[in-house]
Amino acid sequence: MPTIVNCPTCKSKVEWSEQSPHRPFCSKRCQLIDLGEWSFENNRISAPITSAEDFSQDMIEDIEAMMAKNEDDFFK
């Protein structure tokens, strides 16, 4: 049974599958409307941005270890 979601823009039903290339949006139009909302800063992420002070030393070391495993051209 396919998963059905509501288009974030127009609320119409969208099947979450490869046959819906703009998922979770129902169309390219709704996808672009949403992009415009973000570009005009009408949408925001509700959680506060985490400051570096909120990271423990262990977390920082874990992130650095993961980054060290990437190829040298990862950030280019």
Swiss-Prot record:
HAMAP family: DNA_gyrase_inhibitor_YacG. This is DNA gyrase inhibitor YacG. GO terms for biological process: regulation of DNA-templated transcription. Its cofactor is Zn(2+). The gene is yacG. Signal peptide: none annotated. Zn(2+) binds at residues 7, 10, 26, 30. Belongs to the DNA gyrase inhibitor YacG family. Pfam families: YacG. It comes from Pseudoalteromonas translucida (strain TAC 125). Inhibits all the catalytic activities of DNA gyrase by preventing its interaction with DNA. Acts by binding directly to the C-terminal domain of GyrB, which probably disrupts DNA binding by the gyrase. One of its GO terms (molecular function) is DNA topoisomerase type II (double strand cut, ATP-hydrolyzing) inhibitor activity. The keyword Zinc applies. Keywords: Metal-binding, Zinc. Coiled coil: none annotated. Interacts with GyrB. Binds 1 zinc ion. InterPro entries: DNA_gyrase_inhibitor_YacG (IPR005584), Znf_NHR/GATA (IPR013088). Disulfide bonds: none annotated.
